[in-house]
Amino acid sequence: MIYFQCDYAEGCHPKILAKLTETNFMQTPGYSEDAICDAARAAVRKVCGTPDADVHFLVGGTQANTTVISHILRPWQGALCADTGHIAVHETGAIEATGHKVLTMPNSNGTISAQQIHDYCTNHWNDGAHEHIVQPGMVYISFPTESGTLYTKQQLTEIYTACKQWDLPLFIDGARLGYGLMSPACDLTIEELASLCDVFYIGGTKCGALFGEAVVITDDKLKKDFRYSIKRHGGMLAKGRLLGVQFLTLMEDGLYFDICKQAVDYALEIRKAFEAKGVEMYGTSMTNQQFPILSEAQMKHFDGKFAYEYWGRYDDSHHIVRFCTSWATKQENMDALLKAIKEM
């Protein structure tokens, strides 16, 4: 079986594994208070062009989302996001479990707009009973979205402007950040993205690390006591240097971006191959996730040979599935899949 099911099926990039082995018997303080984590934080700041940012290392995406969101919000507030947002549909109520409601808005190809933020906040504050309603306290988006789509620089600028107008911190979930930034459809640099939000994270788990996400806080108002929030949510890894080693390696010599670009290039080959066979694609993803709309017979053509993700029913006779590439996708596996698509 060849896996195109997700972007976390393999372990980690060989350079990371080598560094973990090299530093295995090094003795360091715990809880990310070691020299390696200090160097990794400095490397992240340099890459992001954020010399004054606070950088924290957490283990996984849901943990990062829950920690950041609950740290930002007051008890009576909720997080605005798309109705397809990860915190709304794929985190098993993790945000709600902290006492905060996820306030969803209709998505457009996975994204939300500045106008939706304006409308939601206007409606809330114009309601005479607004004190009886969960107050919007922040905005959550992901880059790329759950649909593999991207916000343009203009869209993100407009969203951040709206957030500033309504005094809402903007949090960008970057679980697949590298794949988004390396898409040919992306008109943003990581420096620009960092300047257009209050907090974001650089995903490692899906982008070459064994595990780990690097939370970057640029808004001074959100920095205070964040490590308390990490500990409270079970995210303070005793052997924190394992996270530092990984992110220091990913940030060196552009490794993070190089391995993500290869995954995107492969994914676009998959998209092109399906389109050449007349297969309709669901959405306009130009990142490492591709969503062909297949008949049951076409799905069976791949079953037993390729693992893919079932995404949902499209109509009475067609289904949306996801083929996902990663930093570790091999050329021979790509060749096999492209051949299978051609023979479909």
Describe the predicted segments one by one.
Residues 13-61, 83-88, 94:
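Conserved N-terminal alpha-helix of the aminotransferase class I/II PLP-enzyme fold
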